[in-house]
Amino acid sequence: MLFRSGAGAVGLMAIIIGTRLSPHDVAGSERKRDGVKAPMPRRGFLVFGSMFFLMASSQSMFVTFGSWLEDEFGFTEAGIAGVAFALGAFELLASITSARRADVWGKERSTIAGALLIVPSGVLLALLHTHQIPGLVLLGLFLLGFEFAIVSLLPVAANIIPSAPGRGLGIVLAGGMLGRASMSVIATSAYDRYGIEWPAIIGSISAVGMIACLAWFSRGSRS
């Protein structure tokens, strides 16, 4: 069930990026291109790293929160499913809000704002994980921050190779999938040994890594 939540997030990303592409991008897909693939700019790998860390951060919670609710509070499968459903609605709200804010704040700033919500939420969850209501609220804020960030990061990814937006987006999403796969092993192992505290902390640290990569990318954009 937890992996379905992650798959739902990826599906939502695909829908959102389709709606966020400008008419120029869509028209560009119809233009004839030569056989030479557009190269990935060096700075683009900072966006690749941003996606890696952001998806790793979310995965640290996606693969562990069900076990945490069951072990710590005795949640049944139905109870965990109810929490997952509520979190999905929460994430949808964050996606809509982020899509609006990105046009006002800018894509990079909106992405960093979402990650900045993840960092304290993960740390506080590690400290308050034995308290059900605060823990659930912090889990919701953690995932809200992720959803806010991912919606804003996708247009950045689509624009790193202006002449081939699909290629740029594909490369960056591959970084995200690598982050998810890596964190699935790390987070579950950490949970088995230490409980939810370490996955929550690791998720916060990953969000800091995302902020660092994107801040570096943004600084290069302005120079």
Predicted regions and their residues:
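Interfacial helix-cap and linker-helix signal at transmembrane-aqueous boundaries
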Residues: 1, 69-70, 101-102, 186-195
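C-terminal membrane-cytosol helix-exit motif in multi-pass small-molecule transporters
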Residues: 5-29, 213-218
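Juxtamembrane intracellular "pre-TM" segments in multi-pass secondary transporters
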Residues: 18-48
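Extracytoplasmic gate region of multi-pass secondary transporters
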Residues: 43-85, 89-95
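Juxtamembrane helix-start elements in MFS-like secondary transporters
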Residues: 75-84, 131, 135, 165-169
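Helix-to-loop junctions at the C-terminal end of transmembrane segments
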Residues: 94-107, 191
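C-terminal transmembrane helical hairpin of 12-TM major facilitator-type secondary transporters
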Residues: 106-153
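A late C-terminal transmembrane helix in Major Facilitator Superfamily
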Residues: 160-196, 203
